[in-house]
Regions:
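Hydrophobic residues within alpha-helical transmembrane segments
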Residues: 14, 58-62, 86, 94, ...
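Membrane-embedded alpha-helical hairpins and interfacial helices in multi-pass inner-membrane proteins
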Residues: 74, 108-175
Length: 175
């Protein structure tokens, strides 16, 4: 495995911080708030190699687990991870990693980036929905109505914007 460069370590830290900031930009809903964290997660997957994307979002999750209020609504701790949004938080790590892997395999074109990011978001939906079903005891359809349907339009826009920014930022970041 290739060692991380100083530049890559810096980008990992920056994306952990960006995810924390984007988590705070939210529209509160009764059970699960809409926020910009998934935007930062797929942007991370679009710009960093898989191991760096995994580390960046993993650091974000670890910061929240040890008590630093980086999760949506300035929440933190193990209790947040085992709450309604815990599945999404766990899903962020895999979403960033999978987005980066698919970007490497499928290529850097805009539509290919959008597809890779959509798969990453879908994985996050799966984790979030299953987690919510287990905690709440709700059926799949009820859980989908709380955990996926309200998020779809905004997440499509986040994917489109993240893919656009990836193309523009990649050139500047890796000169």
């Amino acid at each position: 495995m290739k060692k991380l460069t100083i530049r890559e370590m810096t980008y990992c830290a920056l994306f952990a911080a960006l995810t924390a900031v984007c988590s705070q930009i939210q529209i509160p809903l009764p059970l699960i708030p809409i926020n910009l964290a998934i935007f930062a997660v797929v942007l991370c997957g679009g710009l960093l190699r898989p191991v760096c994307a995994l580390l960046a979002v993993g650091v974000y999750v670890l910061l929240g687990l040890v008590g630093i209020p980086v999760f949506a609504g300035f929440k933190a701790g193990v209790g947040t991870l085992f709450g309604n949004t815990g599945g999404y938080i766990v899903g962020y790590v895999l979403a960033a990693f999978l987005t980066a892997v698919l970007r490497q395999r499928w290529g850097e074109g805009y539509l290919r980036l959008c597809a890779a990011m959509a798969v990453g978001v879908a994985v996050c939906y799966v984790f979030g929905t299953v987690w919510f079903m287990v905690l709440s005891g709700n059926s799949l359809w009820v859980s989908l109505s709380y955990c996926v349907l309200p998020f779809l339009p905004g997440d499509v826009l986040k994917i489109l914007l993240a893919a656009l920014l990836t193309g523009r930022l990649k050139k500047a970041m890796w000169r």
